[in-house]
Structures are given as structure tokens and as C-alpha cells.
Swiss-Prot record:
Function summary: Involved in the modulation of the activity of the glucose-phosphotransferase system (glucose-PTS). Interacts with the transcriptional repressor Mlc, preventing its interaction with DNA and leading to the modulation of expression of genes regulated by Mlc, including ptsG, which encodes the PTS system glucose-specific EIICB component.
Domain of life: Bacteria
Protein transport is among the record's keywords: no
Gene label: mtfA
Chain sites annotated for binding Zn(2+): H111, H148, H152, E211
Main location: cytoplasm
Name listed for the protein in its UniProt record: Mlc titration factor A
BP term (GO), one: proteolysis
Compartmental location: Cytoplasm
Cofactor(s) annotated in UniProt: Zn(2+)
Family (UniProt): Belongs to the MtfA family.
């Protein structure tokens, strides 16, 4: 059982929060005890600073709140919670939701249509999610709705539109853009060869640089074994930006599991 270092100082309300149960999802089991402790500390602050708003009858209990907060804080585990300063509310639907979408075509005509969305991240507003897809984000499959939307927030942290280039030193931007576009082209080539459904990386990553950064951020944390060997140069840039190495965590966990298995009699 993990001994949490903050328990001496936490309030009665915080003590009641089911952090250990919340940490039991597959995505977070690769973290060391020290990393889990740090993540929970950030998640506690997240719940103090942000407002989780359930919509359309969705029931938000303490376990769900904790797991949502943990997933929000995983990408900023080493960056710091201030990287999530760009919003104050998280709106949560029970399932994918319908929105009115307005877009302009190449000749300037404005079109309106109703579309189904899994999530949204407004540059100067809230993050919008749905619980069905949040639940599907608990495993290590390459899909993670919360990390996807957080990546968009990190992308626009410098105040500009999402470009696929997060807030990094100016000298690194050209290299980042080169590697990101190379990854997009590679993903598009696979799509043309085998089709969207059979592609090993979500085809949405090939749609534009901002979505490529968000989708690959999902794979960075939840399927590093697919990301790292395929795009090694971009992988290193992601490791440097997020200041984390999920592939190393995965290898460490696998080594521990193998060692435990060889010692079972």
C-alpha cells in the first residue's frame, strides 16, 4: 500500500477522496509511487482551481472527479499546473454531444451544420468532454480524450491559434515543424495504403498540424510503443517538451512484471 506524504496536511474532505482507487486505471499503473504522489498533489490543486460541470443528467461522483483530474494533470506532471491556466471550467456530457458548427469554404461561403463531437477545447473558454469517451481513456490504447483536449490548450498557451507547435524555445520551432509534418505525411501515406480504419495511428492526426500534435500526445502517454519507434525524432521532441518518457516507464513496468513472473513457484 502506498504511503501518501500529503495525508498529514490534507483536510477531512480531501482525505475522503478515493485517490488510490482513482489511480488503479491501466494508464496510471506505470507511474512510480513518487510520480503517483506528485500527480495526486497536482490533481488535488486542479479540483480546487477548476469547476467540473455535469450536463444533461450526468452524475459526477468523487471517484469520477478524481480520475478526470488525474488525467488532466498527467501531461503537466513535470511542466506544472500553471500550464493549465487557460480555462476554469470543464463541462461534461454523459455521451458525445451535438453542436452547431460554422465554417467557411475556399470561396468565402459560410456553412452551418450540426455535428456530433466527443470534446472541444475553446481557446478562451472551457474544455468540453463526454463521459463515455473519458471512460475509454483509462486504458493504454492510444486513445485519450482528456489528453487530446489538454494538448490543444498547451498548443495555444502562447495566445495564438493552435498550430501543432506548443510553447517551446524559438530555436526549436523549425525542427519541431519539420518532424511533425513528416509524421503527418507518413500517417497519410499509410491511410492511402490500408485505409483509415486499418491505420495504426488515428487518421485524424493527418488532418492538420494541431490535430497531429493532439493525437500524438494521446499516443505519447497511452501507446508509447507505437509512437516512439515510428517517429523517433519527434518522440524525442515530445519527451523534451513534456519532460517525461512514457516508453521508459512501460519498459520498467514490463521488466518488473517479468522479474515477478520468474520468481513465482
Amino acid at each position: 500500500m502506498i504511503k501518501w506524504p500529503w495525508k498529514v496536511q490534507e483536510s477531512a474532505h480531501q482525505t475522503a477522496l478515493p485517490w488510490q482507487e482513482a489511480l488503479s486505471i491501466p494508464l496510471l499503473t506505470c507511474l512510480t509511487e513518487q510520480e503517483q504522489s506528485k500527480l495526486v498533489t497536482l490533481a488535488e490543486r486542479f479540483l480546487q482551481q477548476k469547476r467540473l460541470v455535469p450536463l444533461q443528467g450526468f452524475e459526477l461522483d468523487s471517484l469520477r472527479s478524481c480520475r478526470i483530474a488525474l488525467l488532466f494533470c498527467l501531461p503537466v506532471l513535470e511542466l506544472g499546473l500553471e500550464w493549465l491556466d487557460g480555462f476554469h471550467e470543464v463541462l461534461i456530457y454523459p455521451a458525445p454531444f451535438v453542436v452547431d458548427d460554422e465554417w467557411e469554404d475556399d470561396i468565402g461561403l459560410v456553412h452551418n451544420q450540426r455535428i456530433v463531437q466527443s470534446g472541444q477545447s475553446w481557446q478562451q473558454g472551457p474544455i468540453v468532454l463526454n463521459w463515455l469517451d473519458i471512460q475509454d481513456s483509462f486504458d493504454a490504447s492510444g486513445f485519450n480524450l482528456i489528453i487530446h483536449e489538454v494538448a490543444h490548450k498547451l498548443d495555444t498557451r502562447n495566445g495564438d491559434r493552435a498550430s501543432g507547435v506548443p510553447f517551446i524555445p524559438l530555436r526549436e520551432v523549425a525542427g519541431w515543424e519539420h518532424d511533425l509534418h513528416a509524421a503527418m505525411n507518413n500517417i497519410q501515406e499509410e491511410i492511402e495504403l490500408v485505409g483509415e480504419n486499418a491505420a495504426s495511428i488515428d487518421a485524424y492526426a493527418a488532418s492538420d498540424p494541431a490535430e497531429c500534435f493532439a493525437v500524438l500526445s494521446e499516443y505519447f502517454f497511452s501507446a508509447p510503443e507505437l509512437f516512439a519507434p515510428r517517429f523517433p525524432s519527434l518522440w524525442q521532441r515530445f519527451c523534451q517538451f513534456y519532460q517525461q518518457d512514457p516508453l521508459q516507464r512501460l519498459h520498467r513496468t514490463n521488466d518488473t512484471d517479468s522479474f515477478s513472473a520468474t520468481n513465482v513457484h
